[in-house]
Structure formats: C-alpha cells, structure tokens
Amino acid sequence: MSNHSNAAAVRAFRILEILSAADGPLSLAAIVQAIELPKQTVHRILKQLESTWLVSRTAGNRHYECSSRVRQLAVNVLMQAGPAAARHAILQQLVDKIGETCNLTMLSGDDVVYLDRVETQWPLRMHLQPGSRVPLHCTASGKLLLAFLPSAQRQRLVASLPLRAHSAHTITNAEALHAELAETRQRRLGVNNQENLEGMIAVAVPVMRNRSRACAAIAVQVPMARMTMDQLMGFVPDLRLAADEMVKTFCE
C-alpha cells in the first residue's frame, strides 16, 4: 500500500472513530473540528465512506453516523474477540448459580443484540443464539441500555421506535416509556415483567465503562412457572458482581 493510500485509510478510520464515540449524528463542521483536516478533505472521505455503506446520513441529510454495517461489524468483533471466552465463563458461573438462562447484550442501532448467551438446562426456555436481536422497549436489557444513553440520543431513539405491543404488558406509549427509563436509570436495573412474552420475566444490570455510560448489560430471564419476580430480584446482587467482572473484559 502506498503512503498516500495508507494516510487515506488512517483518516477514514479516524472519522469512523469520531462518529462511533459521539453521542449522536455529527454535522460536517463538527467532524472537521474534531479531526482538524480541511473541510473538502473530510467531505471527500465521508462520500467514500457513504459509497461503501460504512457511514450513513440522518433523515435531514445534514448529519453523519456509523452505518448499520459498521455496527454489525463491531458486534461480530466483540463476539469473536479474545475476551469472548472470559465473558462466556462469567455467564456460565451465573447460570450455574441461578439455574436460568443468562445473556450478555449490547445496543446495536434500534435493537438489543446478544453478544453471548448461556442457556439453562430446563426444557422450557427461549431458544436464541448469540447475534439474535430483540426489541429495546419491552426487554430488560433494552430498557436498561436506553436508560443510560445521553438524553438527546435517548429522546431521538425512543421517538423512532415503533413501540409495538408484544404482550398485554408492553409499554406502547413514549411518555410512559420515558418515565420507566428514568426509574430504570435511577435504580440501575432493567425489569421485564412479561412485556416481551407472556409468562416470561427478566432483570438486567449495566456493565459500566464509566459512571454514566453502560457498554453492555447482563440479564437473566425465567418463566414465571419456575420463579416469581421477587425470587428473581434476589439474584440481582449476583448479576452486579458478574457485571463488575465483565467490564474488565471490555478493557482488554
């Protein structure tokens, strides 16, 4: 690769880094200021990134963000990276103690994606594989990850969600969801009380990279035929201990 090609690749990667670290879509001017390159150069790189589906524009066409292709790439890397075995071991220890399915999840676009999952041995269970996606507004992990987004990004994302009813208990009103998210953030605990599937409950705790941002969530789900919500809440301290261990794998 020539020095010119190498420099162009580094600049393109730097722009992707800036977009991925931002709280929301960025304007051309904001990207120029962050990367300290001429406006024409940044605009040319952005057009190249758009043409390869690595960057997309928002509805107003004035702001840029990482595309769904980049988000899926990030998920794939995390699922296959070196610390994946350590993450799986942490989930396995939780399942051994609780006896129910445990998940490691993260936000990907307007969905929750499973980075890893250890299934219970009980025959009555939900069969989902790592890489599976579930809604944000009616899952314990989804509400938790939404709750820890910066306010503007959270408002924008909630406004874009269809808020479809998955059961009689699903929150389908944006105002009610925002109230739930405020409570979720305060208690640092996501709760799914039959909101995604009748008869299935779940709780989730954040994996915190710093005091205000959750990089992932750990959740346990169980049929109500085997456990009440009060009984499930009794395992929250175990989930929090697991989250403290899990965050170390995101720093490697």
UniProtKB/Swiss-Prot annotation:
SMART domains in the cross-refs: HTH_ICLR (SM00346)
Domain HTH iclR-type intervals: 6-68
Top-level lineage group: Bacteria
Keyword list, A-Z: DNA-binding, Transcription, Transcription regulation
Protein name: Probable transcriptional regulator SauR
UniProt cross-references to PANTHER family, sorted A to Z: HELIX-TURN-HELIX TRANSCRIPTIONAL REGULATOR, ICLR FAMILY (PTHR30136), HTH-TYPE TRANSCRIPTIONAL REPRESSOR ALLR (PTHR30136:SF24)
GO biological process, alphabetically ordered: negative regulation of DNA-templated transcription
Source species: Cupriavidus necator (strain ATCC 17699 / DSM 428 / KCTC 22496 / NCIMB 10442 / H16 / Stanier 337) (Ralstonia eutropha)
InterPro entries with a match to the protein in the record: GAF-like_dom_sf, HTH_MetabolicPath_Reg, Tscrpt_reg_IclR_C, Tscrpt_reg_IclR_N, WH-like_DNA-bd_sf, WH_DNA-bd_sf
